[in-house]
């Protein structure tokens, strides 16, 4: 039940933050939060992560996103009693997927606005709360795969 609350909270924060940007900052405008480190820069991304275009166009991207989201939901259900790293990782990935899928369904593109840089020499891609959720979820999933799953496999092998 706690994970459901986490999922709902992340989706709500993602959608609220995108709404706040769309209603307070014109497209391609920015608001500096911390000089040379963090700004909100309003862009709309019709493609995939990092501004990459999808070879099959926006309709195919939408279909693929729906299918992947359903797959993640299935994994989350299957792993509902597994290790917390797995459950939290999948929950964060699912939350981010739903957040960006909502944008694609309603607007046909995703609102991105968080821009991190280090001085004038390093600038990261512009992203949103949903992207952050997916990234953190992937890190947790990888930590599970590297440390926990390998330990479980080793224990099973030692017991056989």
Where are these regions (language model features)?
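Alpha-helical transmembrane bundles and membrane-interface segments of multipass inner-membrane proteins
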Residues: 1-160
